[in-house]
Amino acid sequence: MSAAGAADVFHRARGRTLDAFSSEKEREWTGPFYFVQGADPQFGLMKAWSTGNCDNGGDEWGQEIRLTEQAVEAINKLNPKPKFFVLCGDLVHAMPGTRWRKEQTRDLQRVLKVVDQDIPLVLVSGNHDLGNAPTAETVEEFCQTWGDDYFSFWVGGALFLVLNSQFLYDASKCPALKQAQDHWLDQQLSIAEQQQCQHAIVFQHIPLFLKSIDEDDDYFNLTKTVRQELADKFTRAGIRAVFSGHYHRNAGGTYQNLDMVVSSAIGCQLGKDTHGLRVVVVTAEKIVHRYYSLDELSKRGLDDDLRELLKE
């Protein structure tokens, strides 16, 4: 697919916002709605993991293609339609500059372009998209392929912030880019606090924590210092939930009024969960989410209790 063709298909983020939604129209609360969250399609990991060669493996990704096609098919069948479909990072397995990256990216774009055009895509960067220690070059490559690496948008009276969590993990090779996101985030959190939006929600790849704010540092979470500072900023600004991936298992916990939601993968499972998607219903008072296996969502769609919430 050409770059121009990709731009036509994906509602890509530019200028730190998402052109799929008019921020002025969307600032007013108009009633309950829902969106779908997925994470880690990570084309190539299943083969790499099965052979024990996660650094250089991943020369096949037919399984991930089929799973992501099933996810897209399930989303397209949903009625009513979700407001958007967010993918929380690790779009492909091949790191920047490595073999198979172009092919994996091409195949993922081919699958994602089938998403109903009335369901905008929201794309979040992960460590495999940018490298564990991103550089200005890897960030630029992501932005050229998928749109801005961090941005905000309004939907139905709720403010959504998309973060580049690699800057929070290791920004040693691009400190100026991290500082720019930090400054932008402070501005956005100030807006969330002052405008008293109905809800404010964050999307990022790496979770703040997996279960508890005071858990030990791990590959799958942010360091204690970073997570505590960020969690405090979020709670002060009234952020209600953070949705992430990265762990390839379902997990999560709470800190004060903040819900940290960790969703398992569309692709490779590292625990006992199933390949799946999370449905998130936003009502005037609360945010209700439920993880569905791809088979469940394909066969039965939204559960009746979630449908009832949409009528409130």
From Swiss-Prot:
Residue sites binding a divalent metal cation 2 per the record: D90, N127, H246
How and how many cofactors are bound, per the record note? Answer: Binds 2 divalent metal cations.
Cell compartment(s), UniProt: Cytoplasm
Catalytic activity reads:
O-phospho-L-seryl-[protein] + H2O = L-seryl-[protein] + phosphate; O-phospho-L-threonyl-[protein] + H2O = L-threonyl-[protein] + phosphate
Phosphoserine PTM positions read S2, S293
Class of enzymatic activity (EC top level): hydrolase
Role of this protein: Protein phosphatase that dephosphorylates AKT family kinase specifically at 'Ser-473', blocking cell cycle progression and promoting cell apoptosis. May play an inhibitory role in glucose uptake by adipocytes.
Descriptive protein name: Serine/threonine-protein phosphatase CPPED1
- Native organism is Rattus norvegicus (Rat)
